[in-house]
Amino acid sequence: MHDEEPEKPASGVRTMNSVLSTLRVFEEVAQRQPIGVSELARCTEIPKSTVQRGLITLQQAGWLKVVDAERSRWGVAPRVLALGLRDCGKPDLKELADPVVKRLAAETNETVMLAERDGDNLVVIATQHTDQVVRVVLDVGTRVPLLATSGGTAIMARLDESEVEELFTHELPEFAQDPAPDFVALRRDIALTAKRGYALNGSSSWYRPQVSSIGAAITDPAGRPVATITLAIPDMRYSRAQEKTFAPLVVAAAAEVSRLLAES
């Protein structure tokens, strides 16, 4: 005679469902940030009140934060990056690139960002800020669409055309700045980036207006673009002369990190 397995208490089932809902909320914020409560409820099909409770729980635990208080939009907190989650056996990109990022920031006295590709997005994994009063600030853990940044353009310039066209069909997150990117102009930018080795993002950017940036792709040993180094400059300080001076430095920095990856 076999002992029957006792039924799980209803409270235990509710607790598990609550945990799963909270994890789902976390995953969607990480994928779509910055994102609001209503949009989260729609895309997860979880009641708005449950989404709100999950967000507060994750905020209290240090995993999420409000990134746009005025519009109640959420994003991941730096603690997520502090876990150091990465594929076993892979070199630590942040550690390899750290001296290169710091040197580029010192050479230019502008903000430098290191970001890894994650699907349709770039995730900032390291920043080195300038000591200037007016500067560009982007938190570690911030996710931005490939289609909205110079780093993303640099990545796409090293992808097959079919991969780029596939990206164009994906849903884009909403930002305060409209309209969304002009795909005709973006195709021209990608072609130009492939030719010269770096991408530019002007001050009229869809994602960060009043910021100009220069980005170059970092490749893995197989030649696939996996990350970017980006130099971000307030538009009030940016000039074409800086492009001529700084772009070769950004390209050289990305090439050096690519070499370090290949040798590690």
Spans of model-derived segments:
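Short amphipathic alpha-helical/adjacent loop interface patches that line ligand
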Residues: 44, 55, 80, 101, ...
